[in-house]
């Protein structure tokens, strides 16, 4: 119920049509002033708002929730919203808890190289998991954290004290909602990746037991119905070497078909068809998203202050045709900090990041523009404010109990998942974005019927 106001004060009531309605009261009578707005104009306004504001508007009425949840508005928002600026996403793990930060990418490349650093402070989003939950497993945490189209995937969490092996968890870092997936036997070791099919609008989890084999691969579709794991076949036996990325509905990760890390293979898993294909790069490489295409990065030399690398970009998936480039990046900070390739920004710059971090030294992100041959360094400050100090050096892609770990994603967008209330029902924390409660006033039956008719128009 909405709070009642004094008789002589202006009141606003919910309307069954898309209109602004004011009830202006006086001592003797009340006047209703209604200004109707075209639905197209309302959508034009709403799609320009930040995702947090649109989330709040879900609680205006059921009619508004229906409008904001329709596929048409979802597409409009994702393609034109001012909040859809690509960002760098930082996830820091310490003492069984993640802290999630993000930082806007540069939309225009740097004009020239600079030895001085730009100092920025990332936006803090949330901590995960909440009290009472723990990260699983405690020791081997390789490839236990994934990201796809706005949602995060955690390989395993102990939800309560009765859990023995933990269950996979999917979380939205923007709103703090999460959902646990069905339990799955994990054998001695197991790895999993998270992907999104943009055609069917479906999230899927690919799970692999170690040692991998034809019958050790399963997949799950994340949705509102009954979820279950399904066995799928993989023709090439391989071990997992790298983290995975999802590009246009295909998961990519590096594997090894030998026992001595000498026969590398890029495993390609089509999220929609649930089939595997394989690319053989010839040597170790990192997989990145290069402007919506698969990119392989080979680091040929790493001197005191320079990095020599080759970049292969997959231009034709059927014929396996590549565009190949070679670069030499030089910065005095390379001598003191090992860096790794993160990906490619929306401005076409190759993004590199420090591979380790402690509170006693700065943390840097580097932007290299291959067309202009410019390198710009950005110093990130403010992690300690929300997650305390880090005395130990943390390593990338290695989850160790007594040190922190970083994962960086170069294509993070604050994605408005309008189906989230159906998919992610639990709330991690009581922040301003998590408290979305319905406040409705009682209506006559004829108002509800009219509202239902207008809801159907947006379904």
From Swiss-Prot:
Residues 31-76 form the F-box domain. Coiled coil: none annotated. It comes from the Eukaryota. InterPro entries: F-box-assoc_dom_typ3, F-box-assoc_interact_dom, F-box-like_dom_sf, F-box_dom. Residues 438-459 have a biased composition (Acidic residues). Gene3D superfamilies: 1.20.1280.50. It holds the Pfam family F-box. Residues 434-459 are annotated as: Disordered. NCBIfam families: F_box_assoc_1. This is F-box protein At1g47340. It comes from Arabidopsis thaliana. The lineage of its organism: Eukaryota, Viridiplantae, Streptophyta, Embryophyta, Tracheophyta.
